[in-house]
Amino acid sequence: MIKGLYTAYTGMVNEQKRLDVLTNNLANADTNGYKKEGTTSQTFADELAIKIKDTSSYGLNKKLGVISMDVHLGETYTNYDQGSIKVTDNETDVALAGNGFFAIAFTNKAGETSVKYTRDGAFTVNTEGYLVTKDGDYVLNQAGAQNTDPNARIRLNPNAKITIDELGNIYQNDQLVTRIGVVDFDDYNYISKYGENLYDLVDGGQITASDAKVQQGCIEGSNVNVVDEMVKMITISRAYQAGQKVINTVDETLDKTVNQVGKV
C-alpha cells in the first residue's frame, strides 16, 4: 500500500516536470526561431537495461539509490522541425528554409565573446554599419561561421540597398559584399540550448555545410503549435489529478487501517 503512495507521487512529479517544459514552450510561442522541447519517460526496466550496459563505473563502489517499479522522466529533448516563415519585407530580416543555423558573436555579461548559433534572423544594421541581432550581437560571415571566428563580422553600407540571395550572398550597389554565415551540424546531440533561441556547440560536435536556403524579408517563427500544447496541458492536468485521488484514497485506507482495524 505504501508503494502505491510512492507510485502516485512519482507520477505527479513527472507530470509537473512535463508541465514545466510545456509552459516554457507556450511562453516562447512568439519567440523567433524557438524550437519546442519535449520529454520522454522511462520505466524501471528501461533504466535497469541502461544501467546494466553502462560499464563506465565498473569496479567502483556505488551508492544506494532509489529503486521503484514506477515511471521516471527520461530526458528533455529539442524538436528541430521547421518553424513557420513570416513575411516582414524588412531587407535585413532573413529566414532559413531547411537545416542550418546563423552564426553570431555572442558577448555575455562578463564581456566574454564566443560563437553561438541561432535560427532567429531578425537582424539590423547598427550605426557603425555592422549587421547585428536584436540584442546587438554581431552576425558572422561564412568564413567566421565555418572557422568559429567571432571577429569575422559583416559590415555594410547603412545607406545602400541590401539584397540577399538564397545562398546568403549580400549585394550592395550590384557588388558582392560578403556572405552570411550559415552552417549545420553533423549530430544535433552535440549542440545545447543557451537561453531560448541560441545554441552552443559542445565538445565532439562537428560543423558541416548547410543546405538551407536563405529567404530575405522573412523571419522564422517558433515551431510551437499552441493548440497541441494546450491539449497536452489538459492531459497532464487530468493525470496529475488522478495521482492526487490515488494518494487521497491510499491515505484514507491507511487511516482506517491504523485507527479502526488496529483497535480490534
Where are these regions (language model features)?
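Amphipathic alpha-helical polymerization modules
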Residues: 1-264
